[in-house]
UniProtKB/Swiss-Prot annotation:
The keyword Metal-binding applies. Pfam families: Metallothio_6 (PF05522). Transmembrane segments: none annotated. InterPro entries: Metalthion_4_echinoid/annelid (IPR017980), Metalthion_4_echinoidea (IPR001396), Metalthion_dom_sf (IPR017854). GO terms for molecular function: metal ion binding. Metallothioneins have a high content of cysteine residues that bind various heavy metals. This is Metallothionein.
Length: 65
């Protein structure tokens, strides 16, 4: 099973396929595994300080993490 990490600011858990997302503070996006981290897409906006890395699909007021 995927390692559960509390990476989001809002306290939501996200699967991270065994990667150390909580230790590094960065997010991994590997297939269906998504964690929170710095968003590399300027068009992505998330409230609450939660941002998604890579091809993030966050919108204002919503975070897929």
């Amino acid at each position: 099973p995927d390692t559960k990490c509390v990476c989001c600011q809002d306290g939501k858990q996200c699967p991270c396929a065994g990667q150390e997302c909580c230790i590094t503070g960065k997010c991994c996006k590997d297939g269906a595994s998504v964690c929170c981290g710095t968003c590399s897409n300027a068009a992505c906006k998330c409230t609450g300080g939660c941002k998604c890395e890579g091809g993030c699909v966050c919108t204002e007021g919503n975070c897929t993490c």
